[in-house]
A protein has these predicted regions:
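Small-residue-rich hydrophobic transmembrane alpha-helices
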Residues: 1-12, 51-70, 186-246, 250-252, ...
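Alpha-helical transmembrane segments of multipass membrane proteins
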Residues: 12, 56-60, 79-87, 115, ...
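Hydrophobic/aromatic end-of-helix segments at the C-terminal termini of transmembrane alpha-helices
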Residues: 21, 84, 157-166, 170, ...
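Juxtamembrane helix-boundary/capping and inter-helix hinge elements in multi-pass membrane proteins
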Residues: 27-32, 63-67, 169-175, 180-184, ...
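Short runs within selected transmembrane alpha-helices of multi-pass transporters and secretion channels
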Residues: 43-62, 70-78, 99-112, 204-207, ...
């Protein structure tokens, strides 16, 4: 119930303050893309209640002993989105609206599957009284969720800073100050961030899968197993980062083509290649850092995890995004991520060593 209330409030906020929100994230009011942004945002805002409900129910379904159903419900929504996107955009000719509607319909599919499961839960049979809000429970939920909230909101703030710096310093660039090329920097970084998010989703999925195992073994006092799991997790995350790094550095043109931008101007292609190779050059460290954030939370160090995440996104991420362009222009925005990842890894490495020492029972070697 709390999720539905919050989602409706957020939907109203997005619909009422759509223009200021888009502007805050770097959209230019007078640009022809602004109308497309408004069109997309309108439909996405309408889908917020379905999206939030589906996402909120997913961990509940997993906790009820149905992880496969939880996965399939999300997968069904994603497949629906993938199938409907080209149909709505091209044969139907709906363009940007078609992409947004396809996304919302995918979210509705996930939400409907969640409702279906809610009526057939294994361990708990919800009654009408269970949907009432209780202050103590709401407070407890908000307390437990504040860590994830701060991490996500800091990431959003960092993304807003990146977009605004791209707009500001793109306007000062010899090429991108021209109207026909003005949208290239933001479009390119958007593609780079999509690729980055795909990789990070894999990283988060692997780390999140360790949480119940860590919780069980920590509760049983089997710290040696936790340490071994941490070692294997860091190794696997580093491998994922290395594969992503090879793709970004060695095959940027192919990645651009995958995202549907193969036939753009030479300025677009050149900047995209530079963006992939520069922005993602520390991908291995980015993956290890993300795994460290989640694992610290799993072993009960929620405060350390939150602080490390906020240092990465706010102090380093936003800080260098605002600072480096003053010296390097538009390229400074691209330098901000690798610099932030290196400095974050230095701090994370200290925490990793400390965590290993705390888990270093039975005389195992400290990393």
């Amino acid at each position: 119930m709390l999720t539905l209330i919050v989602s409706v409030v957020l939907m109203a906020v997005y619909l009422i303050f759509m223009d200021p929100i888009l502007t805050a994230f770097g959209a230019t009011v007078n640009a022809e893309t602004f109308a497309l942004s408004r069109e997309y945002c309108f439909w996405i805002a309408l889908g917020i209640p379905f999206y939030m409900f589906g996402q909120a129910m997913n961990p509940i379904i997993r906790s009820d002993g149905s992880p496969r159903y939880a996965m399939l419900s999300l997968l069904a929504g994603a497949v629906c989105n993938i199938i409907l996107d080209p149909i709505f955009i091209f044969p139907c000719g709906w363009g940007m609206m078609g992409a947004a509607v396809a996304t919302v319909l995918g979210q509705i599919v996930t939400a409907v599957l969640a409702v279906w499961y809610l009526c057939r839960m294994k361990t708990v049979k919800p009654g009408k009284g269970d949907f009432r809000l209780h202050a103590s429970l709401c407070t407890r939920m908000l307390t437990l969720g504040i860590t994830s909230f701060l991490s996500q909101i800091s990431l959003v703030a960092a993304m807003a800073a990146i977009n605004n710096m791209l707009r500001k310093y793109g306007a000062l660039d010899e090429i991108f100050s021209q109207e026909q090329y003005a949208q290239i920097p933001m479009a390119v970084v958007g593609i780079v961030m999509k690729f980055f998010q795909i990789v990070i989703s894999i990283v988060v999925g692997m780390a999140a899968g360790c949480i119940p195992v860590v919780g069980y073994n920590m509760g049983a006092g089997k710290k040696t197993r936790v340490r071994e799991l941490f070692t294997k997790l860091l190794l696997c995350e580093a491998i994922v980062g290395a594969v992503a790094l090879v793709l970004a550095e060695g095959f940027p043109r192919q990645l651009i083509a995958v995202f549907g931008a193969a036939n753009e101007s030479s300025y677009y292609t050149d900047f995209a290649i530079k963006a992939f190779r520069t922005y993602l050059c520390m991908m291995v460290l980015a993956c290890v850092n993300k795994a460290c954030f989640i694992f610290l939370q799993a072993v009960g160090k929620a405060f350390s995890s939150t602080m490390l995440s906020m240092i990465r996104e706010v102090v380093f991420g936003m800080g260098f995004t605002l600072l480096l362009p003053r010296f390097f222009g538009l390229d400074g925005v691209l330098y901000s991520m690798p610099v932030s990842d290196v400095l974050t890894f230095v701090i994370a490495a200290v925490m990793i060593v400390k965590t290993y020492r705390e888990l270093n029972t039975e005389g195992a070697t400290v990393l």
